[in-house]
Amino acid sequence: MPIKLIQVQRKLNVGINTVVEFLHRNGFSVEDNPNTRISDEQYALLVKEFGKDLPEKDRNFAADRMRKEVPSVKEEKTAEIKTVIPEEFRPKIVMKGHIDLDGGQHKKQQEEPKAKEEPKVKEEPKVKEEPKVKEAPAAPAAQAPVKPAQPAQAPTEKKEEKVIVVEVEKEKTVEKQPVVAEPKVESVKPEQEVEKTEEKDDNLFRLNSVKLESKIKVTGKIDLDALNQSTRPKKKTKEEKRKERDEKQKFNNNRPGNNSNGPGAPHKSPNSPTLIKPNAPAKPGEEGDAKKKRKRIKKDRVDVNNTPGTNYPRPNRDDRPNNDRKPRLKKPVKAEVSEEDVQKQIKETLARLTNKNNKNNKGAKYRRDKRDAAVKREHELMEQEELESKVLKLTEFVTANDLANMMDVSVTEVIGTCMSIGLMVSINQRLDAETINIVAEEFGYKTEYVSADVVEAINADEEDDNEEDWVARPPIVTVMGHVDHGKTSLLDNIRSANVIAGEAGGITQHIGAYNVKLQNGRRITFLDTPGHEAFTAMRARGAKVTDIAIIIVAADDNVMPQTIEAINHASAAGVPIVFAINKIDKPHANPEKIKEELANMNYLVEDWGGKYQSQEISAKKGIGVEELLEKVLLEADLLDLKANPKKRAVGSIIESSLDKGRGYVSTILVENGTLKMGDIVLAGTHQGRIKAMFNERNQRVEKAGPSEPVLILGLNGAPQAGDTFNVLETEQEAREIANRREQLQRELGLRTQKMLTLDDIGRRIAVGNFQELNVIVKGDVDGSVEALSDSLIRLSTEEIQVNVIHKAVGQISESDVVLAAASNAIIIGFQVRPSLQARRNAEKEGVEIRLYSIIYDAIEEVKSAMEGMLSPEIKEEITAYVEVQQVFKITKVGTVAGCMVKEGKIKRTNKIRLIRDGIVIYAGELGSLKRFKDDAKEVVAGLDCGLNITNFNDIQVGDMIEAYEETEIKKTL
């Protein structure tokens, strides 16, 4: 008979995996599952292998099982041999043949182990008892087949006799009176033996009895009738069924009596209202067992349906005949009423009420329609405003900061979005239309350009471009690099070879762009912008100002942050890069290290198998400069740069400033066309006729062709660096467009002004010590003003906000002082001075004017001023760990702890924390610190001390005390 792996594991005391592996080795495929059943043959193999610790009878039984299973085809012969033995003991059949097994099998199974413990000689007189008839054979049943093989001991023979008797009895009970039916007996007998072996297993596993029945039905095909006959007595019991029917009738008859006239029920219900309710109808019935079972089931059903905690009403509800109607009484779930339905209902009700009172219905209807129309118009207006709030009305060039204000988002988010699309922008950098569209769309806004007509007017004025007129133009090269890496030295070296000796230096330092003629007759325009900001701004607008970038790195230094930033700007703009490794004449120069650092940034130079050209140079000694210029020209040839010199000039503003003697001066770079004296130029919001032009050597020139930088006089203001300039036909047209742009810029300025909202006030309150620093920036050139404003705005923190309320080119005027006094601002002048009247007004109004020549000094001073406005930061430093080793209770003092300093040094003035099991129990101050009987200022590690804690006495042995100091640190930005 199959047996589960879990049972085999328990019997043999080995793991399931071991059993499965062993069976696999012996050619059996068994699933690794505790509930997998194995055959007797497999079980016998396992017993043979692992059953050394098993009792001898179990091992023999397993072997016998295997023997039995092998000749399973010859069942009849084995059965014939065994049926001969029991016939000697027929006298006992008469006593036990009439036994009917009761329905309560659980009791029998529970009593089995007890029966087996008793001496088996005493069981003969107690054969009549129902449970023990089955139990007595159960234990020795397994030995019946075993003993013929080894009949050695006397006590075992007695057991054999009993076993045989019971086997015969069972055969007889199955057959009832079959004298001739020997084949049935033969076939039943092996099954009975299987039954008994299974019963033996029941010593440990009670549930096997259920499996027993199911397996008997499955295994024996011929004996199903016999098995059904044997099991039938348990189910039939006609007398019990008849009695139950009678009791049901009696109970139903007595039911109404219990509610109305029953004297028993009312007496019992007050005594125990909940428990005796089911027992009340129990009196009329004589047999209580069957009745109790039925009522128990009913009681459970009542308890499930009824809510707990009710007292007397329960029996009445329980006894009602119409209990089935309860679910029908459930109320239907009401549908939720929407706000619109409510409003509609109210309107209809009001309309009915007003109609009753108003006899003149026409007038009321007219007024009602008028009201409805007004409400409808209001709704439409609100919807229109909501739509318009998502539309940004702006000019083509808007700074990142203004765009952020219009969309009511942080400027860092706008810059982050630009970086994600490959654009490096700064706070005050102006964005082109395409970039604005992408950024606005990212934040869910639509754009509407109010300056479209202005752009169209300029575009309409442009001339047609013929490809036949195109000629090669010199490349525009920007030199970029970290401070002190030799950028200026390289430019001076390149320029000194081509500049007349008497004209070196001078104004060329301010122009920032110049044209160099090489020995081979070719020209290169070098651009020396004040910072990489302007370069990026020009690239962002798509104006191809720079064609090639030279990145200078010092060989005795590293690739510095500003160098990395410059490389990123050039890469984002898609400009070819040539690396110049400078200062190779120095003793500590290591060009290979620079190449390695560039390779780590994924910029492989040609020496290392990459695509970027590099040249080792010494700018001071002129080593390698010619080779560098050759490589630059090679890159230019690959780009195939061309322009049309026959059309009107278009270009970019490099720098602008206010010169006291000459007025507003602008350095421009012509990209296409030719600029001539007397041309009408429009640049941003400024326009004017060119009065004079100077080249980088401060010599007057009459015209400037493509890729030529010149300094022009004649504009009515200082245009912003990076603005595009156009040459127009008439001055009137230029003035109209400039005025229109100025108007749009003012409107944009008003739109971007942000009033203080409740959210801002709440945020400031949350920060606590919020400060504002208003600044007015004046400088000599527009590039410096932009760079300084940008740097100051970047200093803003959560606690201090820097606002640049005004910035301009030129000296500090009286109007600047008035504005500063009104807005409580400070004036920062960069390489400019205040006028005499402005200085007097500033002293009178108490306005602070700070003047600087170096941009870094200005930034550092503003930074230190801001740091002075910050509240200091409190830093905590742990000074000692102390372990409590003893605790003393002292009256009027409290709990004193005897401690050992484990680490550091504890001072009398330290603040402390008491830590128990890693959790801070208390934080406070020391009440006293003593060493022996003397007060101590401090105790170092390894010494013991006594201490008590102010207002805390719950100190325990084993607690850790952590001593710490708080120091105020000046906050930095």
Swiss-Prot record:
GO terms for molecular function: GTP binding; GTPase activity; translation initiation factor activity. Its main location: cytoplasm. It is found in: Cytoplasm. Residues 481-488 are annotated as: G1. Residues 136-155, 252-266 have a biased composition (Low complexity). Gene3D superfamilies: P-loop containing nucleotide triphosphate hydrolases, Translation factors, Translation initiation factor IF- 2, domain 3. Residues 97-135, 156-175, 183-204, 212-224, 237-250, 315-326, 333-343 have a biased composition (Basic and acidic residues). Residues 528-531 are annotated as: G3. Pfam families: EF-G_D2, GTP_EFTU, GTP_EFTU_D2, IF-2, IF2_N. Residues 582-585 are annotated as: G4. Residues 506-510 are annotated as: G2. Residues 472-642 form the tr-type G domain. Residues 618-620 are annotated as: G5. The keyword Amino-acid biosynthesis does not apply. Residues 97-343, 353-372 are annotated as: Disordered. Keywords: Cytoplasm, GTP-binding, Initiation factor, Nucleotide-binding, Protein biosynthesis. GTP binds at residues 481-488, 528-532, 582-585. Belongs to the TRAFAC class translation factor GTPase superfamily. Classic translation factor GTPase family. IF-2 subfamily. HAMAP family: IF_2_B. One of the essential components for the initiation of protein synthesis. Protects formylmethionyl-tRNA from spontaneous hydrolysis and promotes its binding to the 30S ribosomal subunits. Also involved in the hydrolysis of GTP during the formation of the 70S ribosomal complex. This is Translation initiation factor IF-2. It comes from Parabacteroides distasonis (strain ATCC 8503 / DSM 20701 / CIP 104284 / JCM 5825 / NCTC 11152). The lineage of its organism: Bacteria, Pseudomonadati, Bacteroidota, Bacteroidia, Bacteroidales.
